[in-house]
Amino acid sequence: MQILVTGGTGFIGRSLCTRLLAEGHDPIVLTRRPGRNPQPGVRSVAALDEVGPVQAVVNLAGEPLMDGRWTDERKQALRDSRIGTTQALLAWMVGLPERPRVLVSGSAIGWYGPRDSAPLDETASPGHDFAAMLCRHWEAEALKAEDLGVRTCVLRTGIVLEREGGALQKMLPPFRMGLGGPMGDGRQWMSWIHREDLVGMILWLLTRDQARGAYNGTAPGTVTNRTFATTLGEVLHRPARLTTPAFALKLGFGEMSGLLLTGQNVQPAHALAEGFVFQYPSLEGALQAIVGAPDR
């Protein structure tokens, strides 16, 4: 398939494009800087009118949630990069003589808002904080593609784990020095997924004709923040007992600290029920694969 990828130069998008090429697909990346960090075999375009016919769209565009305090200006940038990009994709699809067969659009488990320990599947109610409202509006725009005859899946992604990006990249330096540990009381849930499993789930949704609607992009082995810190310390053979106080996170990150001090126990119910198989269902196995080997 010819597949348009927004956010294709990012932490998840580049890995996805590599996998698409390996499986014989033709990824086309929409980016503001087509000449920056090119991937061999991947065509980059700066505007939608340069794309040409595609059979699928993967919409991963979005400014990182954790890069900077949530000022009013920052919040607007987060909205524009997600909701605005999705609206532009829908407007582009309307004018196409032949529309894509499928759209897989990003979202996040922030859709559920801060929750207690009760497991959440895709039928759970949404939250009402900023992150939840951002995800709700983002998904609502993407699902309008169904009205155009485009099979649409929204992927509510958890904490994506790999060593060269995302949350784990920021965590590794202090943990390797023995300075890691839980955040706040450590009881908040962390719903995570290995990047290889997330990329695999995107391909699975692209090619599975029955798939549509919301899917949780999380591994089944959710853990508390304290367990995550302990497990990472064990894999690295380092102590992980240095707690970061909640007040320090609130002081440093403001409203955004809620993403660190609260969580959700999100389960991939739809993916499991429909036959998706995780390579890394447990946290220890995922972390061993990422940072446990001697050469990593």
Predicted features along the sequence, with ranges:
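Conserved Rossmann-fold NAD(P)-dependent oxidoreductase catalytic core, especially the SDR/UDP-sugar
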Residues: 87-129
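NAD(P)H-binding glycine-rich loop region in Rossmannoid oxidoreductase-like domains
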Residues: 35-88
